[in-house]
């Protein structure tokens, strides 16, 4: 679920050709030619996150000690569909990704983006044809994707969410439930800077090699019985156990959970009885154990058609949301924190903060 526009125009065949001029990517982060965009008003930065399930873009400009979003895009593309079974990105998934990336390229061009970082995560890490896919994106779209490792993914998610850490808390357990992997990060109280958002203080992290897409494909996401749900929880719990043992219960004093993912924003939307997704109400929302349990029980009582009909779920997430709940449940059982703060932010915001800090836009380098 996302509060951003889901553009879905038909692709002009001409857009399948790489654009003339410079390409965006990790190795081309400098200023772009002056004729690339007419939307001025300070330097524009772009952060793109191509995940197993979603393609997401944020374009922003520095504003005060943070930044202002000037354009955004989010589309569920299921790039990693079938990768866990076949080991390859399918042609249909590649076409969906290229269509979404073409829209992102045009948005960056229209906003006159001067610096960008375009990351790809688990689907491209795991697929044997990931390099071939990236070469095709460079050729057809003109974008150079950077495949990041799991530690970088965890760090960027933490950087993007640090502003939601309760300043009265000793720290937080951040989790990011993705399509193909899920990250858990122990955060100590954040460190204030001379300018810009606070810096995350990471005590430890782990990346689990599964997410909502891989778990739903393995167990089934359409008809989820209580036994199937518990099997999903048990599989995730076994992967979490070593990390939970390392960071035992004593560390939970003064800690809250901080969740970023479509799973937790969906749960928050259901909890708030939203008829239409509203990021302003979801981002930063607090939920306690009783409220989380009530939503999960409600979702488990729904059949597939009920989930499709829910304005907070819809057809794009109806077969994935219970897998996400199972991952969340395994995390909660391992780390029984009484409060959860919901974040509709994460990797892209972390990328933007990192680039702007490197450029010294908040008065430091």
Regions from the PLM with identified roles:
Residues 53, 114, 338:
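Short acidic/polar active-site loop segments enriched in Thr and Asp
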Residues 49-54, 175-181, 260-264, 346:
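A short acidic Gly-Thr/Ser loop motif
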Residues 40-66:
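N-terminal basic/disordered segments at the start of proteins
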Residues 119:
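Conserved glycine-centered beta->alpha loop in an early N-terminal alpha/beta scaffold
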Residues 44, 170-173:
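Short acidic donor-binding loop at the edge of a beta-strand
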Residues 65-77:
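N-terminal glycine-rich anion-binding loops that anchor highly charged ligand groups
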Residues 1-44:
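Non-catalytic pre-domain segments flanking phosphatase-related domains
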Residues 3-4, 59-62, 78, 82-111, ...:
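Helical "lid/coupling" subdomains associated with nucleotide-phosphate turnover
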């Amino acid at each position: 679920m996302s509060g951003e526009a889901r553009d879905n125009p038909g692709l002009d065949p001409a857009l399948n050709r790489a654009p003339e001029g410079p390409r965006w990517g990790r190795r081309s982060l400098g200023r772009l030619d002056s004729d690339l965009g007419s939307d001025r008003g300070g330097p524009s930065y772009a952060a793109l996150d191509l995940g197993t399930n979603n393609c997401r873009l944020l374009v922003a400009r520095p504003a005060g000690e943070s930044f202002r979003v000037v354009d955004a895009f989010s589309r569920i593309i299921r790039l990693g569909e079938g990768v866990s079974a076949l080991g390859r990105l399918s042609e249909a998934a590649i076409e969906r990704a290229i269509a979404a990336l073409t829209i992102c390229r045009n948005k960056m061009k229209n906003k006159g983006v001067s610096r960008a970082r375009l990351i790809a995560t688990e689907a491209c890490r795991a697929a044997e044809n990931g390099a071939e896919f990236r070469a095709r994106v460079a050729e057809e779209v003109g974008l150079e994707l950077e495949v990041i490792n799991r530690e970088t993914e965890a760090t960027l998610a933490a950087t993007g969410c640090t502003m939601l850490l309760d300043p009265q808390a000793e720290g937080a357990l951040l989790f990011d439930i993705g399509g193909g992997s899920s990250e858990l990060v122990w955060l100590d109280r954040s460190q204030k800077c001379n300018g810009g958002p606070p810096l995350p203080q990471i005590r430890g992290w782990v990346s689990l090699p599964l997410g909502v897409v891989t778990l739903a494909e393995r167990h089934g996401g359409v008809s989820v019985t209580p036994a199937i749900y518990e099997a999903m929880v048990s599989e995730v719990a076994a992967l979490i156990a070593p990390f939970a043992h390392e960071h035992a219960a004593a560390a939970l004093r003064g800690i809250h959970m901080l969740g970023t993912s479509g799973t937790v924003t969906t749960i928050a939307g259901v909890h708030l009885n939203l008829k239409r997704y509203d990021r302003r109400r979801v981002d930063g929302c607090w939920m306690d154990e009783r409220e989380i349990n009530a939503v999960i029980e409600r979702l488990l009582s729904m059949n597939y058609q009920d989930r499709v009909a829910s304005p907070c779920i819809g057809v794009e997430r109806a077969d994935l949301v219970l897998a996400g709940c199972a991952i969340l449940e395994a995390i909660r059982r391992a780390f029984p924190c009484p409060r959860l703060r919901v974040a509709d932010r994460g990797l892209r915001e972390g990328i933007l903060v990192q680039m702007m800090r490197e450029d010294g836009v908040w008065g430091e380098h």
